[in-house]
A protein has these predicted regions:
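Aromatic-Pro/Gly-enriched surface loop or interdomain linker
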Residues: 190-194, 201-214, 221-222, 716-842, ...
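Active-site-adjacent mobile loop/cap segments within catalytic or ligand-binding domains
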Residues: 270, 358-361, 367, 378, ...
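A short beta-strand element within beta-rich, extracytoplasmic domains
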Residues: 289-313
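Active-site microenvironments of hydrolase-like enzyme catalytic domains
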Residues: 406-421, 432-534, 538, 566-589
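Pro/Thr/Ser/Gly-rich low-complexity, intrinsically disordered linker/stalk tracts
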Residues: 617-660, 710-728
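Beta-strand-rich modules
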Residues: 690-710
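Short alpha-beta junction capping motif
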Residues: 730-736, 743-756, 799, 835-900, ...
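A glycine-rich, often tryptophan-bearing local segment used as a flexible ligand/cofactor-contacting loop or short
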Residues: 850-957, 968, 975, 1006, ...
């Protein structure tokens, strides 16, 4: 043995240099060399160890060491091995295979694996780790005081209560100084653009999922899609908005420190939170007061509410705040020792138009029995329009890659006569703009957060600002890069950061690019400033990527591609001083990826997977239990039980992917007429009886499920209204459950087949930019203005596309109520049950909207969202046999049965509802006319929505239906093509079938007249 090795034989063999012997190996004596050769012969079949993963890079054994004294074999893998998820079961499998290949003398040796200088066990996330966890990746779950705690919400100890999460969705609209224009950072493809496409996932699904599990979520971009904005401030307020100051027993005074002041336009270097002042009060047991912020709301709708306060040394952590909205009153407790001098999100609430202090205000109350300082600055309602103006600076820095490795210094390019350029606003809603501009509006310091390039390149500023914003939220010792202990920041303890992107790239056929995860573990000796190991970022990346791939494979595509986990110094991965993942979910350029990516169900599944990954990561890091929150309840029904008493019932939904996602309770929310919902009533039962207060008032209800992990999204919204003068009520059956992607073609043409089916968004689609126009798969990318296959128009940018809001019972019910009838409602699943009692109803109103058979999750051969399912047919047959009347409306009430070759449903529609399908795409104008035969019974004309409307979905392919059987006759035709649009039947019962959705008639007066005519026809007068 050579001196220094003692009893350890080091045998090195570098597979990727087969012609070059390692120096240590070449220095071995002949006996040692023979031993080395025998050992390598034993493990040479290791090329099969990474079968199935080699597409992620070269993976093999780099070297081997044998410790004879301790009877241990150490195997060193090539660096790319850590691109794959590491688990104990996989390592044990590798050891088993290798041990079986070793000759007898090594069979009893232990085997250890290493990669990049670490034991392979170090790459197992804490959640999956068996043994003593790495303390440098752990974090105590301290009893934090939340930033803004909603008093009405329960605590979720096995969820995300008291966790703070910072995230951002992709890029955003930005100012390109070189071209002197505002533009997207990516190309418009397949009807969307990456700059706002991930925003759909976060805004619709991920952010509310995290918040409903108890987390406080911080966004670097504006979250609210409301284009109106109202500011109430002590300096200046919008319109007739007002700040009412009540000193009480104390005195509100203007602080000598700077605060917010509204400005219509922000120019470089301007900070709105240093442009004004704020109010404060020294609170004692004797001194107390209130501040009431009363906005003048320009139009009714949903508005995000933001509040702000100043920085005070003796700030209180329990400041009461009350939001009065159209649904009632919601109370908060504010921790003013953090989050000062910026916008703090309270929630999104419904407000009626105008000034209404009782139903539209925010009140700050000084807490009782407290000593300290309460401060208050501006309150903001709504997201608004972008107000940051840009023009070229005196010089321009070229774009830099986000990846730090290999970067060279950029050369400044002088821009002559820059003062001749005019300042330009984006002209877009603020939510569409890049985070750089929102961060300026939110009071972040420019030089260390959002303008690291001296206003000379907004593109670089934007991606660099995202991580520095996270650091500024936290402050020392985790402050912005290079500031060390100098910057106090906002004192918010952020637990993780998450960057949501999609990638580019194409593949042939139906193969997908798939999901990539990026983290950074190497900078600063692999440690965050607070002493946490940067391997925590790998844990987070592994947990989220693994969950996404697993759930997508089970629900959508069994061979969804899991790409690598890259350990690279991308700005968004390395800058945040907290565990961070940069996600590249799929390729927005690849047709096969976007076929799934445009599906709202896919978006929900991905967002839920991300939430689950985060929840498990944080629970493991904090050493506590995790429970996944339930899915929304279904099988909802309202029933009149006695007088004004209404029974609300529902059923829990089992999550096939999550055994812990079981409800332990429910919240029932109520809305009165067209106001917002209240804060809900908690119950552990699956039904609740309430007594409504007023007749001829519409009461709407929705239910969410809860457990210790969080609260689900609510299920559908049903409604009831009672009329003292009405006999048997109308039963509204909500059969419109569908959400679906647009049709997709991949043959001679490739892309979104919007002419066939534009799909149904979940509530809303804010990511649509315009229709695709390039369907040639061979078209190359030349420039973002000429991106090839998938290229799309820009005419719909900023327009929110309405989808299925699961609340169309209200629209139908409003017309029924105004016609003088009582009504009650149930889901179609409840109506389809064999024991459903159909006798107490005068008529059934079947809502089918854009319901249409769509491939189901988990079983793509089966179709969900079918019209006239067997159970519905059976109960309709029973109902009409007793003389009951039926209204059925929907765009596919004939098409669905025909395209699914459902001869039973076709026959039922003809025999009992007395219509037969003639054509789909019967019209594209939205205009209807009454037939001569029906002119004495129905209104002469009306319109449905066949184009864009901000409040109702587009009906792109209504059905043409013809009368079937004696007693049936046409009542409406589509004006343009004269195709039959509606059919009525008069016999032992009466029915009306409409080939367009009733709720798609946008004019309330026309809807009311149509419903009144139908119900009068049912009366048989």
């Amino acid at each position: 043995m050579r001196s220094g090795l003692v009893s350890k034989v080091l045998l090195m063999f570098f597979v990727f240099f087969p012609g070059i012997e390692n120096i240590a190996f070449s220095q071995l004596n002949p006996k040692e060399k023979r031993m080395a050769e025998k050992v390598m012969e034993d493990i040479s079949p290791s090329s099969d160890l990474f079968r199935g993963w080699n597409y992620l890079g070269r993976m093999e054994v780099d070297s081997v060491a044998v410790d004879q004294d301790n009877e241990r074999v150490e195997i060193y893998f090539s660096p790319h091995v850590v691109r794959i998820p590491v688990r104990h079961v996989w390592l044990n499998h590798l050891k088993y295979n290798i041990r079986n290949n070793l000759r007898r003398r090594f069979r009893d040796y232990s085997i250890e694996f290493y990669c990049n200088g670490r034991p392979m066990e170090d790459y197992i996330p804490l959640y999956y780790y068996n043994g003593v966890p790495d303390s440098l990746r752990m974090k105590s779950h301290s009893l934090r005081q939340p930033l803004a705690e909603k008093i009405s919400e329960p605590d979720f100890p096995a969820g995300l209560s008291n966790n703070n999460i910072a995230l951002w969705a992709s890029h955003g609209y930005y100012y390109e100084a070189k071209l002197d224009r505002w533009e997207w950072q990516r190309a418009r493809l397949f009807g969307t653009v990456e700059d706002i496409y991930p925003f759909m996932f976060t805004r619709n699904f991920l952010v509310p999922m995290l918040e409903d599990a108890g987390a406080t979520v911080f966004l670097s971009r504006e979250r609210d899609i409301q284009v109106n904005e109202v500011i109430v401030d002590n300096d200046r307020s919008t319109g007739d908005s007002e700040l009412v100051v009540n000193d009480g027993n104390g005195q509100w005074i203007e602080s000598d420190r700077t605060g917010f002041a509204p400005k219509d336009t922000l120019f470089p270097g301007e900070n709105p939170f240093t442009s004004g002042a704020y109010l404060k009060m020294e609170v004692s047991r004797e001194a107390s007061g209130t501040l009431q912020y009363i906005p003048e709301i320009p139009e009714k709708g949903e508005y995000a509410v933001y509040i702000s306060w100043g920085k005070e040394a003796n700030a209180l952590t329990n400041v009461p705040c009350i939001v009065n909205h159209s649904g009632g009153q919601t109370r908060f407790s504010l921790n003013q020792q953090m989050g000062y001098a910026t916008w703090v999100y309270l929630g999104t609430f419904h407000f009626q138009a105008g000034r209404n202090p009782g139903r539209g205000s925010v009140t700050i109350v000084t807490p009782k029995n407290s000593i300290g300082v309460v401060s208050a600055d501006a309150v903001r309602f709504g997201g608004g329009m972008g107000n940051v103006a840009r023009r070229p600076a005196g010089a321009y820095i070229p774009r830099q890659w986000s990846l730090k490795d290999g970067q060279t210094d950029s050369h400044r390019v002088e821009i002559k006569d820059s003062v001749r350029y005019t300042y330009k606003l984006s002209g877009k809603p603020r939510w569409m703009e890049a985070g750089r501009y929102q961060l300026q509006y939110a009071g972040m310091p420019d030089s260390i957060v959002y303008s690291l390039n001296d206003n000379e390149n907004d593109y670089n500023d934007d991606y660099q600002s995202r991580g520095e914003w996270v650091n500024y939220l936290m402050g020392r010792p985790n402050g912005p890069t290079g500031t060390g202990e100098e910057v106090e920041g906002l004192n918010i303890p952020v637990d993780l950061a998450f960057a949501f992107h999609t990638d580019a790239g194409t593949t042939p056929g139906d193969s997908v690019i798939g999901t990539l995860g990026i983290y950074s573990s190497e900078r600063d000796d692999g440690m965050f400033p607070d002493g946490t190991s940067r391997l925590a970022s790998r844990d987070l990346t592994d947990m989220i990527q693994s969950q996404i791939v697993s759930d997508v494979r089970l629900g959508f595509k069994a061979d969804w591609t899991r790409r690598a986990m890259w350990d690279r110094q991308y700005s968004e991965a390395w800058r945040p001083n907290v565990p961070t993942m940069l996600l590249e979910l799929l390729s927005h350029q690849n047709p096969a990826d976007m076929k799934y990516g445009l599906d709202p169900r896919f978006q929900f599944a991905v967002a839920r997977a991300i939430y689950k990954g985060m929840a498990r990561f944080l629970a493991a890091r904090e050493g506590r239990q995790v429970i996944i929150k339930p899915l929304p309840p279904d099988n909802m029904a309202l029933e009149i039980v006695d007088g004004k008493k209404i029974k609300i019932s529902w059923s829990p939904v089992k999550d096939p992917l999550e055994p812990s996602a079981v409800p332990s309770g429910y919240k029932v929310y109520q809305r009165i007429d067209n106001n917002g919902f209240d804060n809900g009533i908690y119950t552990t039962d699956t039904s609740l009886v309430i007594e409504v207060d007023e007749y001829e008032t519409i009461y709407s209800f929705k239910v969410s499920a809860l457990n210790e992990g969080g609260q689900s999204f609510p299920g559908e919204t049903l409604a009831v209204s009672l009329n003292q003068n009405s006999d048997d009520p109308v039963l509204i059956v909500n059969g419109f459950d569908r959400v679906a992607p647009p049709a997709f073609a991949d043959g001679n043409i490739t892309g979104v087949a919007w002419w066939e089916d534009e799909g149904v968004p979940w509530h809303r689609d804010m990511s649509h930019v315009g229709r695709q126009y390039d369907y040639d798969r061979s078209s190359p990318w030349l420039d973002d203005d000429s991106p090839g296959n998938g290229a799309s128009y820009a005419d719909m940018e900023g327009k929110v596309i309405p989808g299925n809001n699961f609340d169309f019972v209200f629209c139908h019910g409003q017309a029924i109520r105004d016609a003088g009838y009582s009504f009650v409602s149930v889901s179609d699943e409840v109506f389809a049950k064999s024991d459903f009692n159909v006798t107490p109803y005068f008529a059934v109103d079947l809502i089918y909207g854009e319901e249409r058979g769509t491939p189901a999750l988990f079983n793509r051969q089966h179709k969900d969202y079918r019209v006239l399912t067997p159970g519905v047919q059976e109960n309709l047959e029973r109902f009409v046999s007793k003389g009951g009347n039926v209204l059925i409306s929907g765009a596919y009430i004939g098409t669905d049965a025909v395209e699914n070759n459902d001869t039973v449903a076709i026959g039922f529609a003809e025999a009992y509802l007395h219509y037969r399908w003639m054509t789909n795409h019967a019209d594209n104008t939205g205009e209807l006319m009454v037939t001569d035969k029906a002119s004495a019974l129905f209104m002469p004309s009306l319109s449905y929505n066949a184009g864009y409307h901000p409040h109702i979905y587009k009906v792109e392919a209504p059905d043409g239906i013809e009368p079937a059987g004696d007693g049936a006759f046409r009542i409406f035709r589509y004006t343009a093509g004269k195709v039959s649009a509606g059919v009525a039947y008069s016999g032992s019962y009466r029915s009306v079938a409409l080939g367009f959705p009733f709720e798609a008639v946008p004019d309330k007066e026309e809807r009311n007249k149509l419903m009144k005519d139908i119900l009068k026809f049912f009366q048989r007068d």
